[in-house]
């Protein structure tokens, strides 16, 4: 990679991290006068905790804005002709920014929304295809975290299979491993609570649960 291209890649990854760091859940809570999502449930800023704090309508808004962080990051890299490898890197950087936000003391969400938003640009059919799985798991169990874990793992397996069979460029194989790995890492405490039977449930159709 030439020095100019390398510098552009570094700047795009840094920009994606900062875009990912925008704490929409906290911003919405302040604008609406509602409780800070960090004060409830898991203490995170993502959609599930916004639902606990503000209800499903604002959780949907927060989730869409969080997803847009991944979408915008990848589209920016694509618009600047940075290449596939950089597009994949910025998609991952948005996940990290969302989960380790510089604006809220390196806390944040779990990464599923910006991860899905980036995937929507990179592989839209896979992104849309995992939505029913994500939704079905949450509807059946009321565990948002379990839906995120299974949904991200499913997307990773599908993308890895496509890369291994030559249907996608080889660079996607690393992305298929790194993306779900990051999301699972940021769900580490959820995984522990799931295994102990202590995970918090949500009501995806309207109520608030803690």
Language-model segments: which ranges?
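Helix-coil boundary and interhelical linker segments in multi-pass alpha-helical membrane proteins
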Residues: 1-12, 68, 72-89, 120-127, ...
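Loop-to-transmembrane alpha-helix initiation sites
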Residues: 128, 144-152, 167-179
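N-terminal signal-anchor transmembrane alpha helix
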Residues: 7-33
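Interfacial segments of multi-pass membrane proteins
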Residues: 51-54, 77-80, 93, 97, ...
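Cytosolic, membrane-interface loops and tails of multi-pass inner-membrane proteins
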Residues: 26-59, 107-108, 190-210
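Short, non-helical or kinked segments that cap or interrupt transmembrane helices
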Residues: 35-47, 103-116, 143-152
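C-terminal ends of transmembrane helices
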Residues: 25-28, 95-107, 133-141, 188-192
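Multi-pass membrane catalytic core of lipid/isoprenoid biosynthesis enzymes
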Residues: 52-78, 107
């Amino acid at each position: 990679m030439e020095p100019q291209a390398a510098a552009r890649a570094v700047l795009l990854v840094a920009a994606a991290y900062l875009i990912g760091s925008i704490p929409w859940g906290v911003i919405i809570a302040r604008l609406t006068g509602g409780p800070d999502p960090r004060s409830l449930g898991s203490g995170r800023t993502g959609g599930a905790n916004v639902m606990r704090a503000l209800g499903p309508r604002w959780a949907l808004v927060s989730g869409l804005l969080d997803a847009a962080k991944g979408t915008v990051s990848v589209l920016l890299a694509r618009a600047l002709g940075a290449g596939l490898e950089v597009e994949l890197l910025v998609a991952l950087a948005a996940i990290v920014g969302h989960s380790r936000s510089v604006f809220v003391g390196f806390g944040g969400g779990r990464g599923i929304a910006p991860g899905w938003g980036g995937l929507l640009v990179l592989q839209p059919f896979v992104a849309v295809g995992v939505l029913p799985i994500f939704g079905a798991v949450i509807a059946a169990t009321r565990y948002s975290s379990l839906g995120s874990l299974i949904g991200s793992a499913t997307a990773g397996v599908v993308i890895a299979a496509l890369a291994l069979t030559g249907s996608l460029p080889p660079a996607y194989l690393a992305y298929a491993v790194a993306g779900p790995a990051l999301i699972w890492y940021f769900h580490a405490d959820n995984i522990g609570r799931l295994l102990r039977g202590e995970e918090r449930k949500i009501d995806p159709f309207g109520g608030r649960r803690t």
